[in-house]
Amino acid sequence: MGEDTKATIEPTANKTTSLEKPSEAMAGKENAGGKETQELAKDEDMAEPDNMEIDAQIKKDDEKAETEDKESEVKKNEDNAETQKMEEKVEVTKDEGQAEATNMDEDADGKKEQTDDGVSVEDTVMKENVESKDNNYAKDDEKETKETDITEADHKKAGKEDIQHEADKANGTKDGNTGDIKEEGTLVDEDKGTDMDEKVENGDENKQVENVEGKEKEDKEENKTKEVEAAKAEVDESKVEDEKEGSEDENDNEKVESKDAKEDEKEETNDDKEDEKEESKGSKKRGKGTSSGGKVREKNKTEEVKKDAEPRTPFSDRPVRERKSVERLVALIDKDSSKEFRVEKGRGAYLKDIPNVANKVMRKRSDETLKLLHPILFGGRRGKAAQIKTNILGFSGFVWHGDEKKAKEKVKEKLEKCTKEKLWEFCDVLDIHITKATTKKEDIITKLFEFLEKPHVTGDVTGDTTVSEKEKSSKGAKRKRTPKKTSPTAGSSSSKRSAKSQKKSEEATKVVKKSLAHSDDESEEEKEEEEKQEEEKAEEKEEKKEEENENGIPDKSEDEAPQPSESEEKDESEEHSEEETTKKKRGSRLSAGKKESAGRARNKKAVVAAKSSPPEKITQKRSSAKRKKTDDDSDTSPKASSKRKKSENPIKASPAPSKSASKEKPVKRAGKGKDKPSDKVLKNAIVEILKRVDFSTATFTDILKELAKEFTEDLTPRKSSIKMIIQEELTKLADEEEEEEKKEEDSEKEEAGGSGGGEEVKA
């Protein structure tokens, strides 16, 4: 490698010699220029100056020449310094070339065959050749930049030489001028015309000299460019030879390398390349000692990589499995399952403490509604079939865990998913009073949610009577004095049978809705007429009772009279309410047996309910009217008090007088319409009509029309009595059907041999 570097230095030496040649040529030319100036001086000695202005110009020229001399000296010094710098740069590039060559040798030594990865030696050689070419291109670029710097330096030198020529010319002119001054005396007598001719000749000669000098400059520049190109060619040839030799050496070294190389050495070579790239980017000037420092760093890096590549602790030794313990998860699941049906205490009363709810839940045989209710009450938890009723009866209000809003929204969503009919069933079980026709689904949900949040008794409860019985007694308050033939025992027996016919009655409601829609408008008109008729009847009864009381019942104190009357009224209202419940239940059973009879029964029940509400008003009016009369009469005469006592005593005695009063009603009605048919005739006609009529389509108005056709009379004023007759007939039919059903059930039970079913029916 040392011989190659010497060969590369030779062209630089040639360059220096070639650069010195133009200076020698310039010196010869300057000598020639001096001879020309001497000849010109001789010619000028022959001429005479006209004015003293020439002296001033000469002085100025002298001063300029001095300044130019100084500037030329400074520029020469600068040029010398630049040439020295260029020489130093050339030497530095040589050193860098040597360092790169050594690095390339080291890289070639470090690279080996990659037998594991399937990479051949030829591939590695190709890669190295490509890298060497890239390095050569970089070197060529650097050398071109250096050559351009050299050419610039040559141009500067040429410019300095031109300045020197001009300075020499100025010196020559000075010498000529001094000669002219000495010979002024001799040339004064000569003619002025000769002076002008000489001046013209001198100007022409100066122009010729300047042209010659320009040509000489152009020739010099051409010679310089030729020399620079020759030097470049020589440098390129030397570079190519060096690169070829280096590539050959690298190939030889790679072939000599052993095939059993390790992966650690490959990593070292890769790190070397990265370090070289970073160092080449950071600084172009690089000494030979840096390679050793880079190797130390590379070794440190390889050691760190080896440490990282060391096998870590095996996966089985890690304590990951301790976090996943199946036993704990199973224990948690068992605990949750055990807590499923623990009913927590809420803010309200227990449902078992509310008598109506408790009775309905215990009587409920179809557990579908209860199964749907259970997850709503207990946060989506489904209980066992045997525990559903006990859990529901133990419910006392929602217990919120966590966010109350989210829990409330979930409960409302569950209620919204249910149909309207199921919500009605929930309200029936929980004894929440809702009118099915008018209330919307949203209103039902809000009422249910409010009740379930804090369960409470929805009505007044007295003794063992339930809320439902209390409501029914309030509806039947108008019939205190209208006794029925049915006994209270019938109510209990009918209540036992009501459970059987509930499903059938629910199905019948759908059929009845159509008929009810037609009869709603008529029922309102009928209510008004009935109210008027009942008011008239009540007035007549009061007048008759007053007359009877006047005839002979002993006087009693005013204070004692009202107390027993109120208690007896309560007893009578309870009895009548039981009778009405039996009638309604019988009507529902009939509808279960036949859908046709169900439609009629519902129509009549609706009418009866319509009847029951206005008589409450009448009784209130009646009682208030009586009190007013007693207050007024107590001041005027003692007869009024005796009348009042007499009117209250028959109520104390027994319910028999009320029955007699009820019997008097049809007699009075018959008396009013003497020409009209009697109740017996109407009953017979109604029975025949009911046998013919299709219950799915027929309504109460249709029956009235048929009766009107038979009797050829307008029976609208007797609507109430006709309704009562129809209801009685329907209840009879229902009782007959129930008896048949009972017989069938008993026969089935006897066949099955199960006695438990009978107990459930009694319960």
Curated annotation (Swiss-Prot):
<feature type="compositionally biased region" description="Polar residues">
    <location>
        <begin position="11"/>
        <end position="20"/>
    </location>
</feature>
<keyword id="KW-0175">Coiled coil</keyword>
<keyword id="KW-0805">Transcription regulation</keyword>
<feature type="compositionally biased region" description="Acidic residues">
    <location>
        <begin position="243"/>
        <end position="252"/>
    </location>
</feature>
<feature type="short sequence motif" description="Nuclear localization signal 1">
    <location>
        <begin position="284"/>
        <end position="291"/>
    </location>
</feature>
<feature type="compositionally biased region" description="Basic and acidic residues">
    <location>
        <begin position="295"/>
        <end position="311"/>
    </location>
</feature>
<dbReference type="Pfam" id="PF08766">
    <property type="entry name" value="DEK_C"/>
</dbReference>
<dbReference type="GO" id="GO:0006355">
    <property type="term" value="P:regulation of DNA-templated transcription"/>
</dbReference>
<feature type="compositionally biased region" description="Basic and acidic residues">
    <location>
        <begin position="534"/>
        <end position="547"/>
    </location>
</feature>
<comment type="function">
    <text>Chromatin-associated protein which contributes to the modulation of chromatin structure (such as super-helical structure of DNA) and function. Binds to chromatin of protein-coding genes throughout the genome to regulate nucleosome occupancy and chromatin accessibility, and to modulate the expression of target genes. Negative regulator of stress tolerance (e.g. high salt).</text>
</comment>
<feature type="coiled-coil region">
    <location>
        <begin position="60"/>
        <end position="96"/>
    </location>
</feature>
<feature type="compositionally biased region" description="Low complexity">
    <location>
        <begin position="650"/>
        <end position="660"/>
    </location>
</feature>
<dbReference type="InterPro" id="IPR044198">
    <property type="entry name" value="DEK"/>
</dbReference>
<dbReference type="GO" id="GO:0006338">
    <property type="term" value="P:chromatin remodeling"/>
</dbReference>
<dbReference type="GO" id="GO:0003682">
    <property type="term" value="F:chromatin binding"/>
</dbReference>
<feature type="region of interest" description="Disordered">
    <location>
        <begin position="1"/>
        <end position="324"/>
    </location>
</feature>
<dbReference type="GO" id="GO:0009651">
    <property type="term" value="P:response to salt stress"/>
</dbReference>
<feature type="compositionally biased region" description="Acidic residues">
    <location>
        <begin position="557"/>
        <end position="578"/>
    </location>
</feature>
<feature type="coiled-coil region">
    <location>
        <begin position="723"/>
        <end position="753"/>
    </location>
</feature>
<feature type="compositionally biased region" description="Low complexity">
    <location>
        <begin position="606"/>
        <end position="615"/>
    </location>
</feature>
<feature type="DNA-binding region">
    <location>
        <begin position="694"/>
        <end position="708"/>
    </location>
</feature>
<feature type="coiled-coil region">
    <location>
        <begin position="513"/>
        <end position="551"/>
    </location>
</feature>
<dbReference type="GO" id="GO:0005730">
    <property type="term" value="C:nucleolus"/>
</dbReference>
<dbReference type="InterPro" id="IPR014876">
    <property type="entry name" value="DEK_C"/>
</dbReference>
<feature type="compositionally biased region" description="Basic and acidic residues">
    <location>
        <begin position="72"/>
        <end position="97"/>
    </location>
</feature>
<comment type="subunit">
    <text>Found in a mRNA splicing-dependent exon junction complex (EJC). Binds specifically histones H3 and H4. Interacts with TOP1A, SCC3, At1g61730, At1g20940, At1g13930, DEK4, HDT1, NIT1, SHL, CYP19-1, GEBPL, HSP70-3, PDP2, PDP3, KIN2, RPL11A and PDS5A.</text>
</comment>
<feature type="short sequence motif" description="Nuclear localization signal 2">
    <location>
        <begin position="483"/>
        <end position="490"/>
    </location>
</feature>
<dbReference type="GO" id="GO:0003677">
    <property type="term" value="F:DNA binding"/>
</dbReference>
<feature type="domain" description="DEK-C">
    <location>
        <begin position="676"/>
        <end position="731"/>
    </location>
</feature>
<feature type="DNA-binding region">
    <location>
        <begin position="723"/>
        <end position="727"/>
    </location>
</feature>
<keyword id="KW-0346">Stress response</keyword>
<feature type="compositionally biased region" description="Basic and acidic residues">
    <location>
        <begin position="253"/>
        <end position="264"/>
    </location>
</feature>
<feature type="compositionally biased region" description="Basic and acidic residues">
    <location>
        <begin position="32"/>
        <end position="44"/>
    </location>
</feature>
<keyword id="KW-0156">Chromatin regulator</keyword>
<feature type="compositionally biased region" description="Basic residues">
    <location>
        <begin position="475"/>
        <end position="484"/>
    </location>
</feature>
<feature type="region of interest" description="Disordered">
    <location>
        <begin position="730"/>
        <end position="763"/>
    </location>
</feature>
<keyword id="KW-0238">DNA-binding</keyword>
<feature type="coiled-coil region">
    <location>
        <begin position="214"/>
        <end position="286"/>
    </location>
</feature>
<feature type="compositionally biased region" description="Acidic residues">
    <location>
        <begin position="521"/>
        <end position="533"/>
    </location>
</feature>
<feature type="compositionally biased region" description="Basic and acidic residues">
    <location>
        <begin position="124"/>
        <end position="172"/>
    </location>
</feature>
<dbReference type="GO" id="GO:0045892">
    <property type="term" value="P:negative regulation of DNA-templated transcription"/>
</dbReference>
<feature type="compositionally biased region" description="Acidic residues">
    <location>
        <begin position="265"/>
        <end position="277"/>
    </location>
</feature>
